[in-house]
């Protein structure tokens, strides 16, 4: 009995370690967006460099999710978990010591990729440690860690940046490195070796050709979008090259499917609920660009401090946490209808932000707004948009996975999360490009630029809402609506 009790206690210690990792992955992004204006001023980071750092982090994270999950399946999961956390800590330390923009960006990209490898290991641990009926609670605890990181990240980032006007952003990476090394140590000490030793040819089952084709194709498509502001036409040659590589990736994965070892199961896209849900996840990824443009607008446009900016952004996390709790409970009963409600609520929230923004100071008087006015003018809209985000993401994942066989659940979840992360990266690139273009066109009118970005984000969410409504109307009787 004592041995059994110790085993159960260790499971929850492992969950606690996983909470630390989820907190790390979320708080890194939340703090980083707050620090962008200071990094721009101290490191001379241009528009392209900003996109490489913020959107590049999301892209690197996304590209490593599926390969990371496969690596954990065929090799030693604990070893993958711990070594990737160590790499993340080393990359964060390197970023804190960076002396050039290229050094900083490369460090951030490595950090994002390393955390992308770590993330699917958590799902693997839970699959092995808990049965289906038990998994709800540990996943709920991960949701708590996510909400805490989302709410505290902007505030913590603001505090650290305010500590030192020149190098406060470096403290953010020091904090990230400390958390990563702590999680790696706890993981090594607490997590048992849950997988059997791999055979000599384990690497073949990671589909290395598929990984290379996928990464090269996505990066080739992504570079011209990021470097567009450099007006370098030759870079656009990479776009068709990337498209051709991705076509080759599709053919390769179909061939691998016949052999039984594809990197991604493209046949899942023919499952109606999965295909539509994955598309909604990609489109709604644009919502996360709100954090980036909001941090730039409130600091560079309106003239507030990083700490004030973090406090103003905090209500988004409260709404997201509440929406996640409610959405998780309603997902099985109301299905895609909850997703549609969440998307609609996000749109209403963005509209409320635009209305509240009308009462903020214009570009001609950037320093006259008080913190209470910011909370009153933007807070309600942020709470609503965050509530909509929580009502969208978890229910959409539940409904999207509802018709996927258990034998394909791992691949399906990896593809879904990858699509959402790619949507985040593309959204940041597209929205930030529109932001800078509007600033150039209007002579630096931040108010017009911010409203333009809100309209673009709203357009993506509107398309996702139309897809959700189409699914509700045309879904057959007996399926989860």
Tell me the role of every PLM-derived stretch.
Residues 38, 69-70, 74, 159, ...:
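Membrane-interface helix termini in secondary transporters
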Residues 47-48, 132-142, 306-307, 406-415:
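Loop-to-transmembrane helix entry/capping segments in MFS-fold secondary transporters
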Residues 120, 141, 146-158, 218, ...:
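Glycine/proline-centered helix-kink
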Residues 162-279:
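Hydrophobic transmembrane-helix bundles of small-molecule transporters
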Residues 11-27, 32-34, 235, 260-441, ...:
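12-transmembrane solute porter fold
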Residues 33-64, 103, 307, 311:
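Extracellular/periplasmic helix-loop-helix junction of adjacent transmembrane segments
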Residues 73-209:
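Helix-loop-helix hairpins in multi-pass membrane proteins, especially solute transporters
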Residues 55-69, 115, 119-123, 314-326:
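Central cavity-lining transmembrane alpha-helices of secondary-active solute carriers
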């Amino acid at each position: 009995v004592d041995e059994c009790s110790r085993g159960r206690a260790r499971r929850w210690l492992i969950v606690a370690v996983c909470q630390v990792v989820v907190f790390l992955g979320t708080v890194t992004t939340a703090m980083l967006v707050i620090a962008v204006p200071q990094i721009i001023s101290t490191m001379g980071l241009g528009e392209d460099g900003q996109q490489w750092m913020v959107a590049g982090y999301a892209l690197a994270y996304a590209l490593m999710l599926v390969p990371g999950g496969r690596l954990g399946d065929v090799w030693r999961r604990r070893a993958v978990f711990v070594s990737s956390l160590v790499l993340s800590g080393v990359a964060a330390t390197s970023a804190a010591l960076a002396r050039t923009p290229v050094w900083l960006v490369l460090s951030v990209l490595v950090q994002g990729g390393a955390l992308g490898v770590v993330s699917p290991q958590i799902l693997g641990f839970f699959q092995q440690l808990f049965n289906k009926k038990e998994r709800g609670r540990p996943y709920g605890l991960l949701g708590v860690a996510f909400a805490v990181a989302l709410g505290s990240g902007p505030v913590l980032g603001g505090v650290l940046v305010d500590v030192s006007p020149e190098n406060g952003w470096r403290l953010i990476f020091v904090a990230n490195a400390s958390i990563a090394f702590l999680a790696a140590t706890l993981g090594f000490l607490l997590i048992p070796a849950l997988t059997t030793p791999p055979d000599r040819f384990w690497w073949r089952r990671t589909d290395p050709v598929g990984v290379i084709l996928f990464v090269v194709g996505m990066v080739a498509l992504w570079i011209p979008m990021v470097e567009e502001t450099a007006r370098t036409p030759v870079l656009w040659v990479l776009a068709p090259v990337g498209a051709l590589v991705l076509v080759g990736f599709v053919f390769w994965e179909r061939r691998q499917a016949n052999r039984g070892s594809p990197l991604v199961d493209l046949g899942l896209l023919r499952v109606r609920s999965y295909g539509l849900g994955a598309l909604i996840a990609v489109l709604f990824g644009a919502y996360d660009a709100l954090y980036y443009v909001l941090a730039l607008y409130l600091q560079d446009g309106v003239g507030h401090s990083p700490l004030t900016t973090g406090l103003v952004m905090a209500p988004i996390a409260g709404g997201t946490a509440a929406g996640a709790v409610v959405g998780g409970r309603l997902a099985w009963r109301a299905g895609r209808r909850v997703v549609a409600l969440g998307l609609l609520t996000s749109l209403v929230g963005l509209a409320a932000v635009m209305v509240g923004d009308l009462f903020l100071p214009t570009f001609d008087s950037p320093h006259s707004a008080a913190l209470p006015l910011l909370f009153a003018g933007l807070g309600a809209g942020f709470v609503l948009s965050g509530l909509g985000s929580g009502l969208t993401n978890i229910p959409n994942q539940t409904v999207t996975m509802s018709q996927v066989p258990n034998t394909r659940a791992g691949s399906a979840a990896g593809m879904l999360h990858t699509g959402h992360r790619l949507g985040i990266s593309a959204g940041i690139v597209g929205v930030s490009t529109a932001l800078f273009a509007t600033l150039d066109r209007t002579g630096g009118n931040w108010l017009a630029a911010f409203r333009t970005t809100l309209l673009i984000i709203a357009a993506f969410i509107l398309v996702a809402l139309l897809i959700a409504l189409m699914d509700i109307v045309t879904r057959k009787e007996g399926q989860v609506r």
